[in-house]
A protein has these predicted regions:
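A generic "folded-domain core" signal
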Residues: 19-158
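Bacterial Sec-dependent N-terminal signal peptides
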Residues: 1-24
Length: 158
């Protein structure tokens, strides 16, 4: 009897604690549709000399379509090259199982905006929104990402 109670308690605890609800930073519903977005997380960071670049991801859903919001931040005391997104831009994620997931940028050109901070650094902020192709979201659930490649308007970067 003790074992049955312990097993029942374990199963109930496991089911209730197994998955926490998704926390949204944006959750909007209006006459146009619905939009939900999660918190941004830093995915990649590169530092070399006085140059640094950061990539942040957040998941979003717009009217039932899953999206990946990408925020590129480049900092430098020297020249900061503009990496532009356009309708031909793509984000490739190679998984540990060898498969490659391709995300397609929405039909919107964006080269970011330049800001200078109080320390004399030029900061380029470039946002982008990528759409998941059919069944690619399911592949991401099965295997972790090993390499990320971004195809910009004029360049490709790993």
């Amino acid at each position: 009897m003790k074992n049955a109670v312990a097993i029942a308690f374990f199963l109930i605890s496991f089911v209730t604690l197994a998955q926490k609800p998704c926390e949204y930073t944006t959750n909007v519903t209006d006459s146009i549709g619905t939009y939900k977005s999660t918190k941004e997380y830093m995915i990649a960071e590169k530092n070399f000399g006085e140059t640094a670049s950061y990539i942040f991801f957040s998941l979003a859903v717009a009217d039932g379509m899953p999206l990946l919001n990408v925020q590129l931040i480049q900092k430098s005391k020297g020249f900061v090259k503009a990496n532009c997104f356009d309708k031909n831009s793509k984000l490739f994620l190679q998984l540990n199982n060898g498969k490659v997931v391709t995300l397609i940028h929405i039909d919107q050109e964006n080269c970011g905006s330049m800001l200078r901070d109080d320390k004399g650094f030029d900061n380029r902020l470039t946002p982008g929104t990528f759409m998941f192709m059919k069944d690619s979201f399911d592949e991401l659930k099965k295997s972790p990402v090993s390499i990320m490649r971004i195809k910009y308007l004029t360049d490709t970067e790993d």
